[in-house]
């Protein structure tokens, strides 16, 4: 997945400009947070607008639900309705968010490391935090519907896994 994303980000295309989906004025630790301090630190970090140091063509909803697989090989990426030009960390962070809530912070960090190796670019921790903060209470409601029993899902552990990945990113600063 990280290799495909590096290839997408290498495309030289013009498209609509990036607009953040994150409403900073509405950010707060999730109600079930056990580490509100981690959330507050992450929220404080992204309080000010930041200009990306690098932009590229983005999928904008890059995650395994939008990938086509054949014999354990990634063969395509679907759902390009939100594609735009913006910081590559938005795609990386969105995929990492999904990998974290569904699996673990370790899996999300492995994805980032492979992406960095494949793309030749280090993921800016600020943009990573910015995108990871898209997580909220609605994730525990819509993911079970999206998964629809096709795989095990630990809804109660999602926020804790997000706290772990945020803490790991904040240590990278």
State what each model feature region is:
Residues 1-49, 53-55, 84-86, 156:
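A cross-family kinase active-site recognition segment
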Residues 8-15, 50, 103, 119, ...:
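A general structural signal marking secondary-structure boundaries and capping sites
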Residues 16-19, 143-161:
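Hydrophobic/aromatic-rich alpha-helical bundle segments in the mid-to-C-terminal region
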Residues 44-90:
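Active-site acidic catalytic loop and adjacent metal/ATP-binding pocket
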Residues 76, 93-95, 156:
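Glycine-rich, phosphate-binding/catalytic loops in enzymes
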Residues 89-121, 133-150:
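Active-site activation/catalytic loop segments of kinase-like enzymes and analogous catalytic loops
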Residues 132-141, 157-161, 165:
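Non-catalytic, C-terminal membrane-associated alpha-helical segments of glycosyltransferases
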Residues 166-173:
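Regulatory N- and C-terminal appendages and interdomain linkers associated
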């Amino acid at each position: 997945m990280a290799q495909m994303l590096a290839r997408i980000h290498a495309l030289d295309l013009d498209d609509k400009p990036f607009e953040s989906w994150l409403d900073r004025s509405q950010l707060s630790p999730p109600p079930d947070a056990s580490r509100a301090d981690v959330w507050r630190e992450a929220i404080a970090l992204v309080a000010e607008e930041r200009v990306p140091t690098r932009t590229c063509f983005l999928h904008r909803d890059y995650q395994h639900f939008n990938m086509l697989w054949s014999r354990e090989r990634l063969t395509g990426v679907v759902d390009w309705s939100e594609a735009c030009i913006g910081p590559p960390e938005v795609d990386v962070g969105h995929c990492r968010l999904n990998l974290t809530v569904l699996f673990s912070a370790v899996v999300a960090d492995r994805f980032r490391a492979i992406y960095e190796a494949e793309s030749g670019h280090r993921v800016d921790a600020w943009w990573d935090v910015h995108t990871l903060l898209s997580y909220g209470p609605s994730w525990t409601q819509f993911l079970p519907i999206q998964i629809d029993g096709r795989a095990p899902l630990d809804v109660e552990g999602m926020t804790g896994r997000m706290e772990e990945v945020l803490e790991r990113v904040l240590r990278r600063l």
